[in-house]
Amino acid sequence: RTPKDYYELIPSFSRNTNIIEDQIEMTKKILDGADKDAFTMGTLHGMCASGIHPLERMGEGYNYDQVRQMQVDFLRWDEKKMLDSMERIADGMCILAERYIKDAGVDSVYYAGLGAETRWYTDEEFAKWIKPFDLKIMKAIKDAGGYCFLHMCKSGLNMKRYDEDYAALSDVVNWGVYEAPMSLEDGKKQFPGKTILGGLENRSGVLVDGDEYDVRREV
């Protein structure tokens, strides 16, 4: 498999592309059954995650680590073809973000950023290959009138990659304090003036084994 194969796999997106239409219709149906006073949120996998999903279709049995490494290797192999492909993906995500807010009527978008793990990209590669797309999509969320929730995925992160440019486009910031190397207190310093969203472990601990009292105490 080569970057050329990837390039040929990625389509151009429009407002009426089937996958976008389907997502908006599904979102509308969910909102129809929700409390009208509820604060609502759509989710977008970030540029890095959305960019690896096509790689999963390029071969049988590729696991997560393999496609993560393929993305890095392909970018180092043929930067132009990969960035052209990723631009098309980002354009589709911008359209979906806008339609989430303007057409479906959600209040916010939870943007799940990925790529800051030091095991994959260098700081320079992240800044060149991932960050510009992240910011483009986050700006589309803001321009559409929605609140932007930035989630910083995974462990082993260089949290400094999510710098003031990310902060400027975020209303709320969230990360896994149980795995990312940053406490809530340090996060408040890195993202001054932003709402910090905490959370609990979701694969073990009180959410899995505790009762209501345990959950309340942990919160």
Question: What are the residue ranges of the model-derived segments?
Answer:
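Alpha/beta catalytic barrel-like cores
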Residues: 1-18
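Active-site loop segments of alpha/beta catalytic cores
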Residues: 14-219
